[in-house]
Amino acid sequence: MEFGLKKRARHEVKVEVASLETKYPHNVMLYHYPPTEDVHIDEFEELALERLRLLRVLDRASTRNLRVLSDEWKEIVSADLTREGLRSYLRLCSTGGSAKHEADIQTRRRDYLSHFILRLAYCRSEDLARWFVAREMELFRYKFAALSSFEVKQFLEANGFEIHPLTEAQKDEVKDGLYESTVGQSVAKIELLDFYKVPFTQVLDLVRGRRCFLKAGYAYVNTHDLVSLVGTKQQDEIEQGLQAAKTMVEDVEADERISRTLKALHNSYTGRDYTVCRDAAVPIESLDQLSKTSMPLCMRMCHEHIRANHHIKHSGRMQYGLFLKGIGVALEDSLRFWREEFTKKMDADKFTRSYEYNIYHNYGKKGSMVNYTPYSCAKIIKDVAGPGDCHGCPYKNMDQGSLKTKLSSYGLSASAIDEVMFFVSRGHYQIGCGKYFQLTHNSPVEPSINHPNNYFEESQIAMGNRQKRANGSAPPKARIRPDIKGHGDRSMLMGDDDDELWRIAETQERIMQSQKDISEAFNDDLDLTQIDY
């Protein structure tokens, strides 16, 4: 791929459909040949984030211990894709493989390009590569399962598979074995299925699961299970492609913007931007009650720490203060909340000198005028709390005994605590948080939690205090971290973009006024945000 780096106005990329239909004729492709078209840096980043959102949907489904392609798995993935604004990919995974609609053809292009972009990000370590291959194979199986028998034949022919369905006479010779080995299908349906005769060594997973008929060293595989054979080739293609991508990384990353995008991609936040709350305003008088009903554990514990100690360290102030801004606490109310608590242990002048300016700064009203975004789960999980701290993710940072005690004090039964701890003990902290939400809200559905403000919003919706947003609305456009050295718009940046921005902000603040309590730098967390070139 070639990446055009000249500045251009942002607009929807729309490539000539006729040429695309020739390049991408099928929903299911083996990603054998790298794309050759030019891709602008803006679209490069947008495609990378879009596919990351797609793979994360599959990752969340995989942590629920559901069988891939089971009805429950499909239901969860379908709902999550819709919620993430990825309905075009949902259509790609659930409709005919060679549809000629323009939207489908454009989605195939995005699918193909984004796969190769992510190879450049996930070839860097065995762990990243393993995660990428697993998710891509789930996506491949999902798409392949939607193909009809005729479309499967088209796919096999287009990709050089020298296998053909059995003739009726050939099927009749082994029909008894086919009836016995094909689980979950009636005799009438089995007679309508296509079967393929392949060396048993090519479908060892089917052999192990006794899901095919074996005779004389050959396996007889029906259309639905043929994904086992073609999936092996797909996985080989991806694994070899990752090895090839390693040799390209140095050349591709000669451009700093691409390098920054690829290195930060896996840990980037891809959800909604909570910089400004567009729903109801939240008065500080309601925070005590809201902490019990609508705040996730990480924020509830911060709130209780402040109420008990009338102070909280810098990292905790950032985590909780930005959360309050995101749920709808106005600047004036935020100042009043922090002042009322902190002045219980210090005089008002000290609070004004040491803390007030930082609050203005977080709301983008002083200094560098950066309107920071509340921390995502990815950012919070990475933060480790030291002695006397209360920030970070309690599901990760607390020992299991203390966490169980805390959950019990919040009213969870022993069996409910065990449900939460099942996921926490396996490192699935966000799913544990979602289970906590489900149990405390008596919700029939366990939500996917990727942001504390997302948790709060879902809680308010469940309690009837806010209306649910239109289903399937697309999230904000994929955005990239700003080039701080340039002159682009820096009025709205992610709170995770810490070290470099904070140093610039401090320099400006020293010039504007003498403030000494804003010198603590954030931890480096290269999230992808807004950029103009």
From Swiss-Prot:
Binds 1 [4Fe-4S] cluster. [4Fe-4S] cluster binds at residues 298, 377, 393, 433. Expressed in embryos (at protein level). Disruption phenotype: Mutants exhibit eye defects and a delay in the S- phase of the cell cycle. It comes from the Eukaryota. Keywords: 4Fe-4S, DNA replication, DNA-binding, Iron, Iron-sulfur, Metal-binding, Primosome. Gene3D superfamilies: 1.20.930.80. GO terms for biological process: compound eye morphogenesis; DNA replication; DNA replication initiation; DNA replication, synthesis of primer; DNA-templated DNA replication; mitotic cell cycle. Disulfide bonds: none annotated. Residues 480-490 have a biased composition (Basic and acidic residues). Its cofactor is [4Fe-4S] cluster. GO terms for molecular function: 4 iron, 4 sulfur cluster binding; DNA binding; metal ion binding. Residues 466-492 are annotated as: Disordered. InterPro entries: DNA_primase_lsu_euk (IPR016558), DNA_primase_lsu_euk/arc (IPR007238). GO terms for cellular component: alpha DNA polymerase:primase complex. Belongs to the eukaryotic-type primase large subunit family. Heterodimer of a catalytic subunit Prim1 and a regulatory subunit Prim2, also known as the DNA primase complex. Component of the alpha DNA polymerase complex (also known as the alpha DNA polymerase-primase complex) consisting of four subunits: the catalytic subunit PolA1, the regulatory subunit PolA2, and the primase complex subunits Prim1 and Prim2 respectively. PolA1 associates with the DNA primase complex before association with PolA2. Regulatory subunit of the DNA primase complex and component of the DNA polymerase alpha complex (also known as the alpha DNA polymerase-primase complex) which play an essential role in the initiation of DNA synthesis. During the S phase of the cell cycle, the DNA polymerase alpha complex (composed of a catalytic subunit PolA1, an accessory subunit PolA2 and two primase subunits, the catalytic subunit Prim1 and the regulatory subunit Prim2) is recruited to DNA at the replicative forks. This is DNA primase large subunit. The lineage of its organism: Eukaryota, Metazoa, Ecdysozoa, Arthropoda, Hexapoda.
